[in-house]
């Protein structure tokens, strides 16, 4: 049972939400390097919420390749988090059309099988090691894309047409 308490002081509203201890469990703590001079690394805490099961992704059977690529383009753009939206939409704009059937299937699995979008981001940026089932030619292409050797501006998603 959670508790929500709202209070008003000097014209401002504040809310306190107390969650049960079982709803949040810490699985690991990583240190993320700081980009600001001599500051020490900041801790990054991974949280797993076991109370909300995410349905297992079911691959679409007999989906035409062009329809699959259209779906993947949409899914690359609509991630629900800005970081992956920018990385995956620019990656898809650059590589998706030239992918063959096998590569398209690998990309489909990469963006739809993991239950946490932050995992995809951390694998692509090298913060966490990539699990064996996703460590393939598409992940290598994505990691190369993330390095941005040509220093392309990626502040918004590319136009569709």
Swiss-Prot record:
Keywords: Chaperone, Mitochondrion, Transit peptide. One of its GO terms (cellular component) is mitochondrial matrix. Pfam families: Sdh5. InterPro entries: SDH, SDH_sf, SDHAF2. One of its GO terms (biological process) is mitochondrial electron transport, succinate to ubiquinone. Its main location: mitochondrion. Residues 1-31 form a transit peptide. It is found in: Mitochondrion matrix. Belongs to the SDHAF2 family. Plays an essential role in the assembly of succinate dehydrogenase (SDH), an enzyme complex (also referred to as respiratory complex II) that is a component of both the tricarboxylic acid (TCA) cycle and the mitochondrial electron transport chain, and which couples the oxidation of succinate to fumarate with the reduction of ubiquinone (coenzyme Q) to ubiquinol. Required for flavinylation (covalent attachment of FAD) of the flavoprotein subunit of the SDH catalytic dimer. Interacts with the flavoprotein subunit within the SDH catalytic dimer. This is Succinate dehydrogenase assembly factor 2, mitochondrial. It comes from Aedes aegypti (Yellowfever mosquito).
């Amino acid at each position: 049972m959670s508790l929500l308490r709202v209070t008003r002081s000097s014209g401002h509203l504040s809310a306190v939400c107390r969650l049960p201890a079982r709803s949040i469990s810490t699985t690991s703590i990583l240190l993320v390097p700081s980009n600001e001079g001599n500051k020490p690394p900041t801790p990054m805490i991974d949280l797993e919420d076991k109370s909300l099961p995410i349905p297992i992704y079911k691959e679409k059977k007999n989906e035409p390749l062009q329809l699959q690529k259209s779906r993947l383009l949409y899914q690359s753009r609509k991630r629900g988090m800005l970081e992956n939206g920018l990385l995956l939409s620019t990656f898809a704009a650059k590589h998706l059309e030239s992918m063959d059937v096998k590569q398209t299937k690998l990309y489909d699995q990469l963006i739809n099988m993991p239950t946490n979008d932050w995992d995809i981001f951390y694998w692509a940026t090298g913060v966490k090691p990539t699990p064996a089932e996703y460590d393939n030619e598409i992940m290598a292409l994505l990691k190369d894309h993330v390095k941005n050797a040509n220093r392309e501006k990626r502040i918004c998603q590319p136009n569709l047409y």
